[in-house]
């Protein structure tokens, strides 16, 4: 039996993060998303139906439609079979670390080259390099994530 939960996308709601998306994706629940426009929705709806409020960040949008798309995308990708399971393991926020840098072709772009280790074929060394790069990137851009371990 499925239970039902109503979610209102609101700037005053609980901040959406990986853990919240994961718990929603793993729940045995049907969700109804409410998207306000301009001033929001009637407060009595929130009170009467025990509505959970979720925010996608500390800013205000004209309506909740874009926020609901962000919420849906963050949940759907965590549902088994939606994307390759191996892809989820190394993604940003999975272990409170941001993802390592990505490189594409050409090998040399404006004098900047792909690190040699990534072209070496040594999977163990590549794995270690990516882990160290994830730590470096997280320290640089989101050191707060390292304190949440």
Say what each PLM segment does.
Residues 28-32:
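Loop/turn-to-beta-strand initiation segments
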Residues 18-23:
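Short glycine-cluster motifs
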Residues 66, 78-116:
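Internal, active-site/partner-interface "lid" segment
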Residues 1-2:
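Short, small-residue-biased leader/transition segments that mark boundaries at the very start
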Residues 41, 45-91:
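Structured adenosyl-cofactor binding patch, chiefly the S-adenosyl-L-methionine
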Residues 7-10, 33-35:
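Short beta-strand segments
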Residues 106-149:
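SAM-dependent methyltransferases
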Residues 11-14, 37-39:
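Short glycine-rich anion-binding loops that position phosphate/pyrophosphate groups of nucleotides
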